[in-house]
Amino acid sequence: MTRPYFTAYETRKPPVFAPMSARQRAIWHFLAGCAVAAGAYYLQWRWSASLNADALGFSMLVVGAETLFFLGTLLFYFDFWDEGDTPPRPYDGAAFEATSGAPAPQSVDIFITTYDEDVAVVAPSISDAKAVIAPEDMRVQIWLLDDGDRADMAQLAKHHGIGYFARRENLGFKAGNLRNGLLRTSGDLVVICDADTRLLPGFLQNTLGYFSDPQVAWVQTPHWFYDVPPGESWSDWIVRHIGGTPAHRLVRLAAAVLTWITGRGRIGADPFLADPTVFFDVIQRRRNRNNAAFCCGAASIHRREAVFAGAIKRKSAAVGRLQTRLRQPVATCLRALPLQPYRFHVSEDLYTSILLHEDAAAGWKSVYHPQVEARMLSPMSLTAWAAQRLKYAGGTFDIAAHDNPIFRRCLSWRQKLHYGATFWSYLNVLWAPILLLAPMVSLTTAVTPVKAYSLDFFMHFLPAVVLGELAMLAACKGYPVGPGRVLGVAALPVHWHAFICVLRGQKPRFAPTPKLPLVGGGLRHVLPHLVLLALMSGAAAVGIVRTALGHTGFSAPLLWVNLFWLGVNMTLIARLVPMAWWTPPEARQTEETQTEPEAAHGACQLAN
């Protein structure tokens, strides 16, 4: 057997995420204010002076979608407004007890969770966990938590001399697996790792100090996918295929245009838009200022006391409610309800974060540590990408529908807005299709959402769009925002699937994200995209022909404006299609690939 594909990236070094400078902050705040003013001015004009009276329903539908997007923008601006890093503290046991008034942690358990991952994926995670540097007075123990009860995992744990716990039933998904480990260990602090999470040696050195504050419940560190293909710059690609030099003005202009259209600075780089830098260094880092950075599972470290204290409170309340309803003895109710240190849910990390944040009596805090302390594998197939997006969306929709933190009394209004921004970003499945399909309607029927595509329209519309783009670029510290825009459109079919499942009263239950490249099965994930692209192409052809024939209502401004937006929408949709046949170059010469498992399809099943 040849080496796994990801060994080609072993020498990569993690990025260092610098804080936002005062100048960057001032520019961002100025542009945000301008964008909000321009957006409000545009919407005021849209509602009061631009509605098409001949197609009022269609016109109001479009401007309603625009308004909802603007409200989402306001939420995200609050989300992104400013950084608030928790000052890092070096760990010192004696100083810990002096400042916190509590005994210093004496032990740490490192949990590596696995279900169906290969030995090739899990073994490096164990080796790196063994290399983590710990304080001299700190006992560190590593445990492999196997939800697949596999002999090769038991043998792997034995070979490395680490602890091993297995389960034959999978009650509670990953949260149940973690509970199984928690109930059989005793570490004061618990590090959570997925099967592919490879801790860096300084993980404990750089995170333990935060726990000198006795109210800190967990510390989350960024996810860094070290195997994302680097790709090739557009300039080099143009030179290689067409000629010229990278410094030539036309080459640079063409490269800039291709970057804007595709949302990618390099061709072949990050094919599945997996790079989480914007989420972690922009969103999570800035939520930290309001104690609202939530746990993302892997590469986080937790205080056992906080996790169990919250679980005991919740179980006590649930037992009381059950006893009142069923009028059964307390002992019977206790046996009927499992203790859930991490909430039994497909999004156990987000759910448990909400529950701990709302515990006002305990006053638990979360800390987002902004520097990379672990490396992981990214989705390396369209099936893996779809499984991951389906899991995220299904879990988020389920929480929003059945236990929405917006209505929890003990969360601060700031925390509610931060969590609300997360839910809002998924709820755009309800209004994004309106703006996606509106150009098709106009091109085939000559029905427009505005009175006319006049100079007045462009004077209101262009400032709002341009300032909004500039503000987002400033907010993201120069990180590319195109991938996020592409992802928002490309993932709509997957998010609709998850939304319908939850709407039908089904609980999301999905297979783990495959950790190795998959062969085959990608085409079915882009069938909705291909159908939509065909319909959009047909609409463009109809619009061109009817305009050329001079049909009533068709005009050059209508044609060009809607062709432009249709082209933008088609570019966003088409971005995912080539990925159905993509495999990493390293995997093409190795045996470390998998055929697509049936379980990887992802489905919403009734909760067991």
Q: What is each model feature region?
A:
Residues 37-67, 425-509, 524-598, 608:
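Membrane-embedded multi-pass helical conduit in multi-pass membrane proteins
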Residues 382-385, 391-395, 399-459:
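C-terminal or late-domain output modules
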Residues 27-29, 56-61, 287, 292-295, ...:
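Membrane-entry segments of alpha-helical transmembrane domains in multi-pass membrane proteins
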Residues 87-101, 116, 128-130, 197, ...:
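Alpha-helical membrane-embedding segments
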Residues 1-83:
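Hydrophobic transmembrane helical bundles of polytopic secretory-pathway membrane proteins
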Residues 14-31, 111-113, 118-122, 408-431, ...:
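Loop-to-transmembrane boundary segments
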Residues 1-10, 388-408, 497-508:
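Short, charged cytosolic
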Residues 68-406:
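Internal catalytic domains of large membrane-associated glycosyltransferases
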